[in-house]
Amino acid sequence: MAEKSKILIIGGTGYIGKFVVEASAKAGHPTFVLVRESTVSDPAKGKIVESFNNSGVTILYGDLYDHESLVKAIKQVDVVISTVGQMQLADQTKIIAAIKEAGNIKRFFPSEFGMDVDKVNAVEPAKSTFAIKVQIRRAIEAEGIPYTYVSSNCFAGYFLPTLVQPGATDPPRDKVIISGDGNAKAVFNEEHDIGTYTIKAVDDPRTLNKTLYIKPPKNTLSFNELVAIWEKLIGKTLEKIYIPEEQILKDIATSPIPINIILAINHSTFVKGDQTNFVIEPSFGVEASELYPDVKYTTVEEYLSHFA
């Protein structure tokens, strides 16, 4: 069997980054994480770095904004996975420049882990947020860097514990607010599964220069179907309040940052159905649960059962 690629994760202490690092180490890849020295002294992040150390991950000190340290780190690996957060998406041009200079990278995974930004029809301000990811994609392609874009749609941990109810900390037990008519389908993926599928794609020729869509059939659901699963789990029918699209668009226009961004992303997802309103063609994409049927992914029903 071929040797497993050495992987560098940039942004590994972030929300989805932790799961990617864990999956990489678990799969037996020599795993490296780029961290700033200041990160280690941060109480919460320091604990994460410590857990990486304990699982055999190599910590490399460096910074997205320090070109030398970036090139030095990249030269030690075969694959770079970026999981940087929203504020640093545009600065991934610095990673692209370092990859070009290093000249040894077999594949780059930019920070995606959401909707396929080439397929969305979002309104502002989500439109501008997605546009940054589009610019990074085009920059990677223009430089001829081999890539995989991971479209993992909705993080279960963001959406399912509250069933996307505004301002809620628990799932609804009496009434539920539904965007639009509740028929547009979205996809909900548990974060460990996102990490697992991402790492499986690293050395897979089938995912090279393609988008890897994580769209398991049991987790591809309309909001009405999602509510029906929850109702079954709690043995109760909820009162349903449907918010028409024109009201949602008004709310987006009048809400402050970051509420307006969240509302606009939810509009794209749950009203427009931007995660599911296209067919995955072999020319540009592959679907994770089809490629890796051995992965026992967490279903939405299993996930929600912990809250029932």
Curated annotation (Swiss-Prot):
SUPFAM superfamilies: NAD(P)-binding Rossmann-fold domains
Site (Required for activity): residue numbering on this chain: 265
Signal peptide (residue range): none
Description of what induces expression: Triggered by EOBI in flowers.
GO molecular function, one term: nucleotide binding
Site (Confers substrate specificity): 86, 89
Cystines in this chain: none
Protein name: Eugenol synthase 1
Organism for this UniProt entry: Petunia hybrida
The gene coding this protein: EGS1
